[in-house]
Amino acid sequence: MAMALALGGGQDAERKVKVAEVALRALLCGLGALAAALVATDTQTRTFFSLQKKASYTDMKAMVFLVDAAAVAAGYSLLQLAARCCGGGAMSSGRGDGGGRGRALSWCVFSCDQALAYVLLAAVAAALQASVVAKRGQPELQWMGICALYGAFCRQAGAGLATAVVAGLAAVLLAFLSAFNLFRLYGSGGTKS
């Protein structure tokens, strides 16, 4: 209710919320796909004394988790966009039939959006931590940083991580919007017994 009042109230506020949701889902879809593609295609081969060593994102399990989470985020957002645009909006707003089915769908979307935000943020945090170790090393354990040796690999991984951070922020905003869409169904403005 407070968000609707802040947006101007009435039908105009409803339209703004729907536009914001579609925009966030489209942004998350694009950024998730871009982050997954940047990290998944990241490889670099170096030759050391006639031995070829290849750095790949699969060498760090946190990066594999990030690729998986970003790809799932992109796919889920694409499915939600299709349902939102083709299904008339009942999937997200919960107002499709005015009753229990709409609320059940809203709870499902809310739960999935929350889970997606948590998983994507966990993947980003793990990948950032692994990247710091890759960049700086861990002197206490005598681990050296590898970014001096695999510069192109680290730059592309950094671009993928930056994209994933923005995708994670979009997922958090989408989770907030999903919570708003759900809990406004239980608002005090004219609930029927």
Swiss-Prot record:
All ranges on the Extracellular side of the membrane: 40-61, 135-156
Topological domain spans for side Cytoplasmic: 1-18, 83-113, 178-193
Organism superkingdom: Eukaryota
Location relative to the cell: Cell membrane
Keywords assigned by UniProt, alphabetized: Cell membrane, Membrane, Transmembrane, Transmembrane helix
Membrane topology: Multi-pass membrane protein
InterPro entries: CASP/CASPL, CASP_dom
Family to which this protein belongs: Belongs to the Casparian strip membrane proteins (CASP) family.
Subunit details: Homodimer and heterodimers.
Record-given protein name: CASP-like protein 2U1
Organism name: Sorghum bicolor (Sorghum)
